């Protein structure tokens, strides 16, 4: 098993924002899942069904969470064709904007 380092911003700011303010704990779960799956590459190709199975969320819940993350510009999803599995790029918009 390899280690996974989570940016402190994710727990300190993003968690309360997505769960508390946006009332979307599933979006937080999916963000962390995608960040882990993307690893150092920063991108991962995964289906809604696989995300649902891996996170324990329903497929509909995962679809809503991904839509929420896309609106918040926390993930970028691209597809080669309409029916292909999306390629997700996990973004960290706070990097470079925070002092220190």
Model-assigned labels for residue ranges:
Residues 1-53, 60-61, 83:
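Short recognition helix of helix-turn-helix/winged-helix DNA-binding domains
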Residues 59, 63-100:
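Winged-helix/helix-turn-helix nucleic-acid-interaction surface
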């Amino acid at each position: 098993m390899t280690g996974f380092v989570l940016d402190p911003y994710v727990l300190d700011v993003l968690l309360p924002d997505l769960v508390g303010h946006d009332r979307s704990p599933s979006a937080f779960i999916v963000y962390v899942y995608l960040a882990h799956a993307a690893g150092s590459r920063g991108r991962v190709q995964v289906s809604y069904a696989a995300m649902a199975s891996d996170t324990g969320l329903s497929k509909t819940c995962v679809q809503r969470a991904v839509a929420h993350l896309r609106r918040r510009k926390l993930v970028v999803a691209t597809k080669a064709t309409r029916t292909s599995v999306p390629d997700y790029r996990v973004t960290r918009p706070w990097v470079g904007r925070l002092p220190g």
